[in-house]
């Protein structure tokens, strides 16, 4: 029996060291050299170098002077990141969407874009379609007393056109650019 146990335990120990230590260290080292910004979390910094968030994670922006992200089922917490898992027929989902729609519709800008009412699969999607951001421009312009045309130009400059998929806007990056206007 010892002839089988010793090689098996040795193999388990060897694989634990390789897959649990050597491989992660090698991948981290290569990532730090080749993609240092992404390896460190795609952090977004302000002019003073302070970290304001990650380009990969949505934030809860409050107040009329900011563009708002899409709703989050996990309160924008990375640990509790998840979808709501509520079915379309669930009354709790219908109540939340109706409440959000009523708040957004008060601005009187027409039908509310779906992206401002629905959560993403992770609950932390940092991107919105340009139409959902454009819907918020009159509210932000009024709160900051900035011409609508200036915010539309800011939106056009912040719109990303990925190789695959529709155009998107990173709300954190857009609000970072907006912060340069002051409040």
UniProtKB/Swiss-Prot annotation:
<keyword id="KW-0997">Cell inner membrane</keyword>
<keyword id="KW-0633">Potassium transport</keyword>
<keyword id="KW-0472">Membrane</keyword>
<keyword id="KW-0547">Nucleotide-binding</keyword>
<feature type="transmembrane region" description="Helical">
    <location>
        <begin position="11"/>
        <end position="31"/>
    </location>
</feature>
<comment type="function">
    <text>Part of the high-affinity ATP-driven potassium transport (or Kdp) system, which catalyzes the hydrolysis of ATP coupled with the electrogenic transport of potassium into the cytoplasm. This subunit acts as a catalytic chaperone that increases the ATP-binding affinity of the ATP-hydrolyzing subunit KdpB by the formation of a transient KdpB/KdpC/ATP ternary complex.</text>
</comment>
<keyword id="KW-0630">Potassium</keyword>
<dbReference type="GO" id="GO:0008556">
    <property type="term" value="F:P-type potassium transmembrane transporter activity"/>
</dbReference>
<dbReference type="GO" id="GO:0005524">
    <property type="term" value="F:ATP binding"/>
</dbReference>
<keyword id="KW-1133">Transmembrane helix</keyword>
<keyword id="KW-0067">ATP-binding</keyword>
<protein>
    <recommendedName>
        <fullName>Potassium-transporting ATPase KdpC subunit</fullName>
    </recommendedName>
</protein>
<dbReference type="InterPro" id="IPR003820">
    <property type="entry name" value="KdpC"/>
</dbReference>
<keyword id="KW-0406">Ion transport</keyword>
<keyword id="KW-1003">Cell membrane</keyword>
<keyword id="KW-0813">Transport</keyword>
<comment type="similarity">
    <text>Belongs to the KdpC family.</text>
</comment>
<dbReference type="GO" id="GO:0005886">
    <property type="term" value="C:plasma membrane"/>
</dbReference>
<keyword id="KW-0812">Transmembrane</keyword>
<dbReference type="Pfam" id="PF02669">
    <property type="entry name" value="KdpC"/>
</dbReference>
<comment type="subunit">
    <text>The system is composed of three essential subunits: KdpA, KdpB and KdpC.</text>
</comment>
């Amino acid at each position: 029996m010892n002839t089988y146990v010793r090689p098996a335990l040795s193999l388990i120990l060897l694989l634990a060291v390789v897959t649990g230590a050597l491989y992660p260290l090698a991948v981290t080292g290569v990532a730090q050299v080749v993609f240092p910004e992404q390896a460190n979390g795609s952090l977004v910094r302000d002019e003073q170098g302070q970290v304001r968030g990650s380009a990969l994670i949505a934030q809860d922006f409050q107040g009329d002077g900011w563009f708002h992200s899409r709703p989050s089922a996990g309160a924008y917490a990375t640990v509790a990141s998840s979808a709501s898992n509520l079915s379309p027929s669930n009354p709790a989902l219908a109540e939340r969407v109706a409440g959000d729609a009523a708040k957004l519709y008060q601005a009187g800008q027409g039908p509310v874009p779906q992206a401002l009412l629905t959560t993403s699969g992770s609950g932390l999607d940092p991107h919105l379609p340009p139409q959902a951001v454009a819907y918020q421009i009159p509210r932000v312009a009024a709160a900051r007393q900035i011409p609508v045309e200036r915010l539309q130009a800011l939106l056009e400059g912040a719109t990303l056109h990925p190789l695959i998929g529709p155009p998107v806007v990173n709300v954190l990056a857009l609000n970072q650019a907006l912060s340069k206007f002051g409040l």
